[in-house]
UniProtKB/Swiss-Prot annotation:
Keywords: DNA-directed RNA polymerase, Nucleotidyltransferase, Transcription, Transferase. SUPFAM superfamilies: beta and beta-prime subunits of DNA dependent RNA-polymerase. CDD domains: RNA_pol_B_RPB2. DNA-dependent RNA polymerase catalyzes the transcription of DNA into RNA using the four ribonucleoside triphosphates as substrates. Its EC number is 2.7.7.6. This is DNA-directed RNA polymerase subunit beta.
Length: 1250
């Protein structure tokens, strides 16, 4: 029977049949717990690892005693505003002991600022919120695997993998010889390694590992006789080319495997080794050959010939028996040797581990033991923030240790202090690098609260020490049985990362070793009752148990209602009697992740569509007016609460005041607390973060209540979209390919309107020619352009701006050229005012507009931290209200996505019998083949819920069924089939068939048409091919590719094609002439030779092929260089020049730049290049500086004509003359830059000169 449940301030009718036994854990505890562990234990552990540091003589000793974290300099909000890192100073107490004099110096040393985690599990690095994603890696330990040889024989392999250190790999061959590879070198017989470890004779080896034909065959291959020989043999492999000596070899082996600094298994590696190699796991199912006796007390544990079950195996193991001969079911006899269970604190391997691994391999040949599945979650562990940070910190400390040792030997022993020894740079750099550029440190996805939450719960197999996309095969990516309750089988990205990035399941948690655990209810085997005792199991432990599903019916006393219970055991689904069941699931949603658990009727959707649904919910933009779904799953409240976007009451109390910007609560202990609300700030993704109070003055609040909604929340529940009236029908072909038809009402009433905030910044820097200045006094700009700027030259808040408008006025000093006599006179008369400055103002980018909502100014005078060379920084925030429009992408929660094709006036939309027009029309063809029937269930239940005026919850795998929905429809007096007659809005006639209609939750996704639409007339061109760049970011053109050319060829549209491939693309001269012809209203001239064709010729010539281009009559066509063509076109266009510098004249069109107004190098009035007499000019340093300046700033060089302002008075010079004979290549560079500079100048105007 459906029951009413409270979800925050709202009640929902829940169709759940299963009672919640366990409350869901905090959804971001994974991040917080890991970081807390790092601060508590992780840091301490590392300082202990490197302490004490001794110099090479052993006289000076440096010890790290303890550490403390200070208070952060700025609050979280201030850090975001000032673009600094939220961090606290780390101080370490260090003791320096001089053993000769016995002198002890203690000092507190500052070890850099350490980034702190915010309460929501993020870090603020340089003002941006970032998340450290947890990594799934292969756990350290030993892994056994098998392969079938082409001859049909089974070969076994064993690999011992440490967390850091040398790998040890064992393998067998066709002749049953066991080999070992030490640290990826050439293989040796495994007995050589055993000898080197101190088992000198053959007999000792056989006694240690157990006698078998495999070991005897390996001994036959082994040429060594003694421990020394074996050591030398290994040394030859590891250090080829060095003279071998037994002592050196022993030392090498010692450091390679038994030195804690060089070899580290971690606790988890030791735990896994002990677990895999222990007797109790290996002897179950065999029988004893001799009597088994307790090694210490002499007590008989088992007689000969007794079958060993689980209990007896544990008893033998706990007694400390390390080796046992057992009989297999097929009669074979095997000696099983364990590793002697070294203490969990031993982080290196021990001799007995290697013996036990070789013994395990021998047992595998006989059929005892099991090979490992590398993709099983028992063999993969999670490295969370704390551990990732610890590994990075360790690298920094190791580098620091090296520096300290060097300084100890160099500095004077008597006056030395700890502070002088320690160089914190490597540590600070390692931490900075980790947070700034590690693959696992991600810019937080803040599109909506769900995106934030999912980002923090993500598990990635990529990253340092993990897999790479290219190498990862299908097996790693597949859903595995051990994922049940640990990783979501649904939520993973589509594309190259599929299966490599997953999401933590709802109830999962991570244990001390980094393995994912999931909770189960224990079943009492005696009474057969399902208890409320909760046990967390790792994937390994789960494999031993038979587990019933959460929806298995129970009697009121907690026993199973059916005599056969459907259960899981490893990868099988079994029907077993209740007495055999060990555990039961706690909840049906423990299988899936948060995002997937938010999809109602998930059980009715095809998995691949559910995957799209859970991924697309994370892309929903927060809307202006939020609305929780009529049909939810009951997870909405919890996910909004844990995401941290809402304001939560910290204690019980009464609301004194609630305004738009703050809520004031008086607690019961009479304390008054002010909660500041976030107002219209920009998220990482440019969406709008805004909080609004949902309590009123006088309301009573309890601890943990939501008192203010954040973005995409409604009354404390997650609200990513809106409930709209949907019909599944065709509409004049506008549904083609999943397109969506919407009612104009949705635009008019701002149903799907969202606010987007863009940030633009402008820096005033120091340049070589003087400081840049932020000012209202901008050259060559009319007063109408400056109308919205204040006296400083910064736009006023509230101004409406369009593309190209000035946001911040800024001028940059121009390079001074040699002045002519006239200019000197003017300068003398008018003073400095005529000094040249360039307009480098910050303007609104192409295609953007909006209203200025905030301006922030940072200057050095105010003590703001600015990057070097920056004197002032201005940030302008621009907001846009984006109504829903054609081309926007929308989706439901079931993977049903589409693009809006048409917006229909309200009066033309189909309407219901009561006159209500439909809001959205979806294509009915999107349902059958996609198999996401959940949307149909949702639309029926939504209609009933809306009519009855209630909200309902249908939890995943435990929600409403067809019968429930039918009952709800009848209760609401709606047709039980959920269909109704619709009338055509244009004719008023009813449609032929009834149509499925109802309320459905629709999302507006982040792929907005305003961000994607783009157009260009002229713009930047590529340097080599001279073709327009591509893409919106580069302000590029539309690519006309090979296949498009075929299309025009097929039509025979020769002229269109010719002009697309020449004057509209890379015929440089043709472009200029065509532009001029259009401006003058003349006929467009014949196209010339495209630049890319010249590039092709040049490439062929570079292969030493003499390529000529001939015309129809066989005459050679001369292909001019780009620069010569430019000179020619300037002459053709009659551009007047003055001493190599262009005369100021208005450009024909503001945007197209100065394509026709090229800087002319020559003009008819001047001698041609050949006639210029050669002058050898020795360059003085100042001149060289100017050449360098011209090279650094190509645009400026181009603007002043070729000479770059270097020529004397009116004398134009040849480039080559500027350099001595040895400098031809430099001269070429200037030429190259000259060509480029002119192009840049055309394309960008002066804007891009920085």
């Amino acid at each position: 029977m459906p029951k009413i449940v409270q979800a925050g301030r709202r009640q929902r009718l829940s169709f759940s049949r299963i009672d919640e036994v366990l409350e869901m854990p905090n959804l971001i505890e994974l991040q917080r717990n890991s970081y807390q562990w790092f601060l508590r234990e992780g840091l301490q552990e590392m300082f202990q690892d490197i302490s004490p540091i001794q110099d090479f003589t052993g006289n000076l000793v440096l010890e790290f005693i303890d550490y403390s974290l200070g208070e952060p300099k700025y609050s979280i909000e201030e850090c975001k505003e000032r673009d600094v890192t939220y961090a606290a100073p780390l101080r370490v107490r260090v003791r320096l002991i001089n053993k000769e004099t016995g002198e002890v110096k203690e000092q507190e040393v500052f070890m850099g600022d350490f980034p702190l985690m915010t309460p929501t599990g993020t870090f603020i690095i340089n003002g941006a919120e970032r998340v450290i994603v947890s990594q799934l890696v292969r756990s350290p330990g030993v892994y056994f695997s098998e392969q079938i040889d082409p001859s049909g024989k089974k070969l076994f392999f064993a690999t011992m993998i440490p967390n850091r250190g040398a790998w040890l790999e064992f393998e067998s061959d066709v002749n049953d010889v066991i080999y070992v590879r030490v640290d990826r070198t050439r293989k040796l017989p495994a007995t050589v390694l055993l000898r080197a470890l101190g088992f000198g004779s053959d007999q000792e080896i056989l006694d240690a590992v157990g006698d078998s034909e495999y070991i005897r065959r390996t001994l036959e291959k082994d040429s060594t006789e003694s421990e020394e020989e074996a050591l030398i043999e290994i040394y030859k492999r590891l250090r080829p080319g060095e003279p071998p000596a037994a002592d050196n070899a022993r030392q090498l082996l010692e450091t390679l495997f038994f030195e804690p600094k060089r070899y580290d298994l971690m606790h988890v590696g030791r735990y896994r080794l002990n677990k895999k190699l222990a007797l109790k796991r290996r002897i179950v199912g065999t029988s004893t050959v001799d009597r088994v006796v307790h090694p210490e007390t002499g007590e008989v544990l088992a007689e000969a010939g007794v079958q060993i079950d689980k209990r007896l195996a544990e008893k033998i193991d706990e007694a400390g028996v390390d080796a046992l001969t057992v009989r297999l079911r097929d009669g074979g006899i095997v000696r099983v040797v364990a590793n002697g269970r070294p203490d969990i604190r031993v982080k290196t391997i021990v001799r007995q581990d290697i013996v036990a691994v070789i013994n395990y391999m021998v047992s595998l040949f006989k059929g005892l033991g099991s090979v490992d599945d590398i993709d099983h979650l028992g063999n993969r562990r999670v490295r969370s923030v704390g551990e990732l940070l610890q590994n990075q910190f360790r690298i920094g400390l190791a580098r620091m240790e090296r520096v300290i040792k060097e300084r100890m030997t160099i500095q004077d022993v008597d006056i030395i202090t700890p502070q002088a020894l320690i160089n914190i740079r490597p540590v600070v750099a390692a931490v900075k690098e980790f947070f700034g550029s590690s693959q696992l440190s991600q810019f937080m996805d803040q599109t909506n609260p769900l995106a934030e939450l999912t980002n923090k719960r993500r598990l990635s197999a990529l990253g340092p020490g993990g897999l790479s996309r290219e190498r990862a095969g299908y097996e790693v990516r597949d859903v595995h049985t051990s994922h049940y309750g640990r990783m979501c089988p649904i939520e993973t990205p589509e594309g190259p990362n599929i299966g490599l990035i997953g999401a933590l399941a709802t109830f999962a948690r991570i244990n001390e070793y980094g393995f994912i655990e999931t909770p189960y209810r224990k079943v009492d085997q005696e009474s057969g009752r399902v208890t409320d005792e909760i046990v967390y199991l790792t994937a390994d432990e789960e494999d031993e148990n038979i587990i019933a599903q959460a929806n298995e019916p129970l009697n009121p006393d907690g026993t199973f209602a059916r005599d056969r219970v459907t259960c899981r055991y490893r990868d099988e689904i079994l029907q077993v009697p209740p007495s055999q069941v060990d555990y039961m699931d706690v909840s049906p949603k423990q299988v899936v992740s948060i995002a997937t658990a938010l999809i109602p009727f998930l059980e009715n959707d095809d998995a691949s569509r559910a995957l799209m649904g859970s991924n697309m919910q994370r892309q929903a933009v927060p809307l202006l007016r939020t609305e929780a779904p009529y049909v939810g799953t009951g997870m909405e409240y919890r996910s909004a609460w844990d995401s941290g976007v809402c304001v939560i009451a910290e204690n019980d109390g009464v609301v004194l005041r609630a305004t738009a910007s703050e809520v004031v609560v008086q607690y019961d202990d009479m304390q008054v607390k002010k909660y500041k609300l976030t107002k219209f700030t920009r998220s990482n993704q440019g969406t709008c973060m805004n909080q609004k109070p949902i309590v009123r003055a006088g309301d009573r609040v309890r601890k943990g209540d939501v008192i203010a909604d954040g973005p995409s929340t409604d009354q404390g529940e997650l609200a990513l979209g809106r409930n709209v009236l949907v019909a599944y029908m065709c509409y004049e072909g506008y549904n083609y390919e999943d397109a969506i038809i919407i009612n104009e009402r949705l635009v008019r009433e701002d149903v799907f309107t969202s606010i987007h905030i863009e940030e633009h910044e402008c820096e005033a820097r120091d340049t070589k020619l003087g400081p840049e200045e932020i000012t209202r006094d901008i050259p060559n700009v009319g007063e109408d352009v400056l109308k919205d700027l204040d006296e400083r030259g910064i736009i006023r808040i509230g101004a409406e701006v369009r593309p190209g408008d000035i946001l911040v006025g800024k001028v940059t000093p121009k390079g001074e050229t040699e002045l002519t006599a006239e200019e000197r006179l003017l300068r003398a008369i008018f003073g400095e005012k005529a000094r040249e400055v360039r307009d480098t103002s910050l303007r609104v980018p192409h295609g953007e507009s909006g209203i200025v909502v905030d301006v922030k100014v940072f200057t050095r005078e105010n003590g703001d931290e600015l990057s070097p060379g920056v004197n002032e920084l201005v940030r302008v925030y621009m907001a846009q209200k984006r109504k829903i429009s054609q081309g926007d992408k929308m989706a439901g929660r079931h993977g049903n996505k589409g693009v809006i094709s048409v917006i229909v006036p309200e009066e033309d939309m189909p309407f219901m019998p009561d006159g209500t027009p439909i809001d959205i029309i979806l294509t009915p063809l999107g349902v059958p083949s996609r198999m996401n029937i959940g949307q149909i269930m949702e639309i029926h239940l939504g209609w009933a819920a809306k009519t009855l005026g209630m909200y309902v919850a249908s939890p995943v795998f435990d929600g409403a069924n067809e019968q429930d929905i039918r009952e709800m429809l009848l209760k609401a007096h709606l047709p039980p089939n959920g269909k109704t007659v619709l009338y055509d809005g244009k004719t008023g006639e009813p449609f032929d068939n009834e149509v499925t209609v109802g309320y459905k939750y629709m999302l507006k996704l982040h792929h907005l048409v305003d961000d994607k639409i783009h157009a260009r007339s002229t713009g930047p061109y590529s340097l080599v091919t001279q073709q327009p760049l591509g893409g919106k970011a580069q302000f590029g053109g539309q690519r006309f590719g090979e296949m498009e050319v075929w299309a025009l060829e097929a039509y025979g549209a020769a002229y269109t094609l010719q002009e697309l491939l020449t004057v509209k693309s890379d015929d440089v001269v043709g472009r200029v002439k065509t532009y001029e012809a259009i401006v003058k209203g003349e006929n467009v001239p014949e196209p010339g030779v495209p630049e890319s064709f010249k590039v092709l010729i040049k490439e062929l010539q570079s292969l030493a092929l003499d390529v000529k281009v001939l015309d129809e009559s066989g005459n050679e066509i001369e292909l001019r260089e780009l620069d010569d063509e430019m000179d020619l076109s300037d002459r053709d266009l009659e551009i007047p020049t003055l001493g190599g510098a262009e005369l100021a004249k208005p450009a024909p069109d503001a945007q197209a730049g100065e394509e026709s107004g090229e800087a002319g190098e020559e003009s008819e009035g001047e001698p041609e290049e050949e006639d210029v007499e050669e002058i050898d000019v020795p360059l003085d340093p100042e001149e060289l500086e100017k050449v360098a300046g011209a090279l650094k700033n190509p645009v400026r060089a181009g603007r002043r004509g070729a000479g770059g302002g270097l020529a004397d008075d009116d004398q134009e010079m040849d480039e080559e003359d500027l350099f001595d004979e040895g400098d031809e290549d430099l001269a070429d560079d200037v030429g190259l830059y000259r060509g480029r500079s002119r192009r840049l100048a055309d394309d960008f105007g002066d804007e891009e000169e920085e």
